[in-house]
């Protein structure tokens, strides 16, 4: 069983990830104030003592703790460490240190540094729980505290004898830089103190506003946590960590794209050149900014290999070895050269020049970002795949004009399982969660691009990925009584659906584009008239109506982008 400690934005993220498993887990918060959507999770509210936590873990067979609590919940972090249970820390990003800020290791250190700096009028943005910690300062120096406008925060101030007239409250929404500047000007402070709370909590706006006004800024650094915990920074890395510690929790395992593997291999190869290091693992950023750390093999300067890990997706490339060789060039540019086992592009439409190695645009950008973070000179990057030419014969690369090898692909860096019964069941579980939290409308998209397009039009629409299982997703939505469905679909899948195929996988339905004179479905947007797409939408709607007979149904064609 898994126990999550939350009450934060990260806590919500952990809940969303664990709900995907469709199995019970516990979610504990200090109070019941946080509204969180639970279907399979069990909510625990209230302060737990050390003994309470230890007893609960023992009685409920807790094998993994996800610590998604606030960075400054020091007593809780200490108790979690004492359980002896494996811990995953869902850690927010803190960013680099900022010049001009005085960093403090704790509140005692902050008080000493504020006294030395001659602070006379302090604005404390560190929360009600720090009123007591800063007491020796505010008893002798004018201080205004901004706190949450709730009873327990005000009571905390009263309990510590803080002047109620010197309290101000956060607005309903997180203030931006200009709003923070106006507030600070009204308060008339000459310094602020806040916590190193990371990218959430408005830290950046507070600091930018104060520095723009010429105020002194004191930041209390976040406490250090045990080195033997597993640290993750987002939903993908959290799921991978849970898969590692509790292998049977998720019915399906996610994996890495070839693009993610090539990026990690390239970074390791470059590090071996620049630093004479041979790392056993490297960290790199996924397209959404989440940082992932994976094992690498690096035994000679400029060359490194990553073995593509195993997911539950029926992927012919599982376990293949992807190698990157990096050498400096004199052009100042990053160039992608041909490597064994990686195909050559022979037709337009992929967003890659004809004749280039089939390293798709998103992996190219990921690789470029990692190189540029380390060096500004030019490099030649040669990606190769062991047995890639043979593996390519088991793919559909030839249909898009990629010959003599595989493509290095991936828009998210993560492979989500798409093609078995368990994935269809996971669609049902996500729909059950949506229904349980009161959703009457649902969006369906094949993947992340479609989800982004639907959410751009309707930010509050809950979107579920159907992969290729359009019919199954719509049936389940109908059976659960959803009143409205918005189906986002890209043109290639839409043509199959318009022809009556409710499973759009290329293994099930082949798409013959030659009759339109194109080689890639996305090229249809450039050669066909608007009436063509209107007709496609109408036919898609007609077939979807057979499995979603009641309620409002919308079909939206989504214009594809380069993968």
Predicted regions and their residues:
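A structural signal for small-residue-enriched, beta-sheet-centric alpha/beta enzyme cores
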Residues: 253-256, 400, 406, 411-534, ...
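Short, polar loop motifs at secondary-structure junctions
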Residues: 27-35, 90-95, 128-131, 148-152, ...
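N-terminal beta-loop-helix "entrance" segment that forms/cooperates
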Residues: 26-48, 99-102, 154-160, 291-295
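Anionic-ligand binding region
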Residues: 127-167, 177
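A C-terminal functional module that forms or caps the active site or interfaces directly
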Residues: 158-165, 170-187, 191-213, 218-222
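Glycine/small-residue-rich loop that forms an oxyanion/phosphate-binding "nest" at active or ligand-binding sites
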Residues: 54-110
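Generic N-terminal targeting/processing segments that precede catalytic cores or assembly contacts
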Residues: 249-398
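Glycine-rich, highly charged phosphate/nucleotide-binding loops
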Residues: 40-60, 169-179
């Amino acid at each position: 069983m898994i126990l999550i400690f939350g009450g934060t934005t990260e806590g919500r993220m952990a809940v969303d990830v664990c709900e995907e498993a469709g199995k019970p887990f516990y979610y504990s918060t200090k109070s019941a104030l946080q509204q969180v959507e639970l279907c399979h999770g069990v909510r625990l509210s209230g302060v737990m003592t050390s003994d309470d936590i230890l007893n609960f873990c023992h009685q409920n067979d807790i094998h993994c703790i996800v610590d998604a609590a606030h960075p400054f919940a020091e007593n809780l972090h200490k108790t979690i460490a004492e359980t002896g249970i494996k811990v995953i820390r869902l850690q927010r990003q803190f960013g680099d240190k900022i010049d001009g800020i005085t960093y403090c290791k704790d509140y005692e250190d902050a008080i000493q540094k504020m006294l030395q700096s001659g602070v006379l009028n302090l604005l404390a943005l560190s929360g009600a729980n720090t009123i007591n910690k800063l007491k020796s300062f505010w008893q002798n120096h004018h201080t205004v505290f901004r706190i949450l406008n709730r009873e327990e925060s005000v009571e905390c101030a009263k309990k510590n004898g803080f002047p109620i007239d010197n309290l101000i409250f956060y607005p309903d929404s997180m203030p931006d830089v200009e709003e923070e500047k106006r507030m600070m000007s009204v308060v008339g402070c000459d310094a602020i103190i806040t916590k190193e709370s990371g990218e959430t909590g408005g830290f950046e706006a507070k600091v930018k506003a104060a520095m723009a006004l010429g105020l002194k800024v004191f930041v209390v650094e976040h406490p250090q946590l045990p080195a033997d915990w597993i640290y993750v920074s987002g939903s993908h890395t959290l799921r991978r960590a849970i898969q590692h510690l509790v292998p049977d929790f998720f019915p399906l395992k996610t994996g890495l794209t070839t693009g993610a593997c090539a990026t990690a291999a390239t970074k390791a190869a470059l590090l071996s050149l620049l630093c004479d290091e041979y790392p056993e693992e490297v960290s790199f950023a996924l397209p959404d900014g989440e940082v992932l750390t994976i094992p690498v093999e690096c035994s000679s300067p400029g060359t490194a290999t990553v073995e593509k890990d195993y997911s539950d997706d029926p992927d012919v490339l599982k376990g293949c070895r992807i190698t990157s060789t990096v050498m400096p060039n004199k052009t100042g540019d990053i160039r992608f050269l041909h490597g064994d086992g990686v195909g050559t592009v022979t037709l337009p439409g992929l967003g890659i020049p004809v004749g280039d190695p089939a390293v798709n645009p998103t992996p190219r950008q990921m690789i470029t970002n990692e190189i540029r973070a380390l060096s500004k000179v030019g490099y030649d990057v040669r990606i190769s795949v062991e047995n890639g030419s043979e593996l390519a014969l088991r793919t559909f690369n030839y249909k898009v004009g990629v010959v003599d090898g595989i493509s290095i692909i991936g828009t998210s860096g993560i492979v989500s399982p798409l093609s078995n019964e368990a994935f269809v069941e996971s669609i049902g579980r996500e729909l059950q969660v949506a229904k349980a939290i009161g959703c009457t409308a649902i969006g369906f998209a094949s993947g992340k691009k479609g989800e982004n397009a639907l959410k751009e039009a309707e930010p509050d629409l809950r979107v579920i990925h159907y992969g290729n299982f359009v019919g199954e997703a719509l049936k389940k939505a109908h059976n659960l009584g959803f009143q409205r469905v918005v189906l986002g679909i890209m043109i290639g899948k839409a043509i199959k659906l318009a022809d009556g195929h409710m499973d759009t996988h290329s293994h099930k339905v082949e798409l013959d584009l030659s009759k339109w004179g194109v080689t890639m479905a996305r090229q249809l947007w450039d050669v066909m008239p608007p009436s063509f797409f209107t007709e496609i939408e109408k036919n898609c709607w007609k077939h979807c109506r057979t499995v979603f007979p009641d309620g409002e149904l919308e079909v939206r064609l989504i214009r594809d982008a380069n993968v």
